């Protein structure tokens, strides 16, 4: 019942006098609440399309920068273990070189916690010019979401403000798990 009561989670703020136990509860409760909110907002039709595109691809590349790069590395590891040719690229020059070698049988998964990194948006445009499919994981209404063939939009809400980087990364990784096991 507590998981269903969103007010329970959003009312927490970190207080300097919080004990470690209270702080732990606040971080976990906020993270759980936000993950459940994100799950309920996912577009199932787009998830189906993304899973289908990945299943039919000859090669998958995961593109990301900065804090999104560990999510891309985790994704590449999951797909590699499924014996699917995949790579993770966080270097911009390598991304552009790779983009020029892609074709209609390939998929790029572009991962961005902001959706505004111009270098990633530019790379996605190049990938699309070679007819490869681009699946994006990013916030809604961002430049990246507008450039992807399949935009899996992930909006981490205000309730996650006390631990947004953790919550965001866990949400992205959970969606990668859905894509991998789908």
Region roles according to the model:
Residues 1-45:
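HTH-adjacent hinge/linker in prokaryotic transcriptional regulators
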Residues 23, 46, 167, 171:
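Conserved acidic
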Residues 43-53:
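Short, acidic loop-to-helix structural element flanking the phosphoryl-transfer center
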Residues 52-182:
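Glycine-rich phosphate-binding loops that contact phosphosugars or nucleotide phosphates
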């Amino acid at each position: 019942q507590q998981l269903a009561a969103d007010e329970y989670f959003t009312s927490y703020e970190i207080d300097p006098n919080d004990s470690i136990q209270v702080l732990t509860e606040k971080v976990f409760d906020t993270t759980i609440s936000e993950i459940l909110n994100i799950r309920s907002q996912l577009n199932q039709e787009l998830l189906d399309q993304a899973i289908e595109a990945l299943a039919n691809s000859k090669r998958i590349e995961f593109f990301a920068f900065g804090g999104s790069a560990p999510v891309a590395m985790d994704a590449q590891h999951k797909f590699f273990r499924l014996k699917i040719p995949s790579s993770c690229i966080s270097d911009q020059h390598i991304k552009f070189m790779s983009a020029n070698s892609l074709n209609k049988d390939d998929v790029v998964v572009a991962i961005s916690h902001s959706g505004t990194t111009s270098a990633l948006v530019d790379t996605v445009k190049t990938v699309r010019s070679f007819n490869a499919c681009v699946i994006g994981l990013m916030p809604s209404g961002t430049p990246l979401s507008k450039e992807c063939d399949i935009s899996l939009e992930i909006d981490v809400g205000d309730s996650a403000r006390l631990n947004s980087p953790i919550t965001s990364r866990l949400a992205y990784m959970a969606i990668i798990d859905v894509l991998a096991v789908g």
